Amino acid sequence: MQRVASQFAVLISAVVIVLPGTVAAETDDAIPPSPGVYKGREIAQTMHYLGAPWLTRESREREEDGSTLLKALGLQRGEVVADIGCGNGFYTLKLAKLVGPEGKVIAVDIQREMLEFLKEAAAAEGIKNIDPVLGTVIDPKLPEGSVDLVLLVDVYHEFSHPEQMLAAIRKSLKPTGRVALAEFRAEDPKVPIKPLHKMSKAQILKEFPPNGFKLVEEFDKLPWQHLMFFQRDDATKE
């Protein structure tokens, strides 16, 4: 097991390398530079699309127990879900099946190549309720007040502009909408991920409440990740 963990740690450190010119180009001069460090946390770089096969590796379900994560989301048919940092669709395709044809998944990524991989995978499975969206580093381009659940799996720590992204996500939520945040546990040294790609609960709570969110639920039964649910701090009760 130790050998497997070591190999995994090496692998994840390899696939997060960013090459020039691969992230969606930004033309808005108003986009500020990334702070680099946010509330004491160094911001990680975005994973390059050449690492996409790692996202759908055979061992991912066993290592992360994605089936349990999906059950914990409590999704209903007909809901609108935004999968931000969707990559090549490991969760997107499953989400689309859960919400059914009457629901929709807005799949957001900042790399066109990732979205092309996703489109190919969706077409191969005949899934038609996915809306691919090319976002930017400050805006996931979600329709305001329309999303039931925003899913962030191992991606928030890579947001180069966390405050702008959280503000945009907050605007996209319905009055009872939720954000499901999954991040590798920084508190657990046995989780074979580089520290830069982990977050502690304490750090998460340093970042979300000041940006207009309240913690409403925690799920602690995943092998490697925290799963924390947030709503707008002014959210109405269901």
Which residues are covered by each model-predicted region?
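Class I SAM-dependent methyltransferase SAM/SAH-binding core
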Residues: 82-139
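A short glycine-rich, Lys/Arg-flanked "PGG" loop and its adjoining helix->strand segment in the class I
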Residues: 96-97, 163-178
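A short acidic, Gly/Pro-enriched loop at the edge of an enzyme's catalytic core
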Residues: 140-149
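Conserved class I S-adenosyl-L-methionine
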Residues: 178-205
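Core SAM-dependent methyltransferase catalytic element
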Residues: 216-238
